[in-house]
Amino acid sequence: WELPAIDPDDDGAADYAGPLLSDIDFGAFSHSALVRIADEVCLQMHLLNLSFVLAVSKRAGDDKELATSICTRQLTGIAGVAAERISRALGLSADLDGLATVLRLHPLLNPAGYVAADVNDGRLRVWRSAAHDDGAWISLCSPGSLRPLQAIATAIDPHLKVEITGTDSVWTAEFQHCDTPAEDYPEVQVAKVSGGARFDFQPRRSLPLTVL
């Protein structure tokens, strides 16, 4: 798939042209450019993850089960932290509506042109896509692998429980309210120790740089 083109007539900067600055001023870009930047970040993130998968697979050798287990643990930790950060940043409600918004924006289902999925009526439907062919994050979720999606649900509301039906690459996840709250998985607890999990973007003025 191809990323959408930036509208040069949209208000704000449409590219990186101009003086060399000390930092990126996101507020200077047009809406169209910011959408493209977000898509590029999602793409870069998935490329980094695929490099992680290749490295783990090389170290695991013939033990594919071990490699899958390690990659799933990594996803579970990141999934829970990312869901919590998205929800907090957007001030979303701790219910199915808030969960639906988080899922649509979550790295697990993005870039949207890469992962075939639909979120509606408290359900997440997934079909086989290029992401499955590449062994990306979504390929680690299935009826037999609930933890990444449960980590997302728990981050929004500990009373939400996920059930998945279908095959390894074509499945439906349903989220329902339960009486007993779930606790964060150990993978999520470990991920929260990272300083990156607590990082917040702050408005900063970009200063011009002079190359000598």
Model region roles, listed by residue range:
Residues W1-R123, H132-P148, T154-L212:
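N-terminal accessory segment detector
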Residues V126:
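Phosphate-moiety recognition in structured ligand-binding domains
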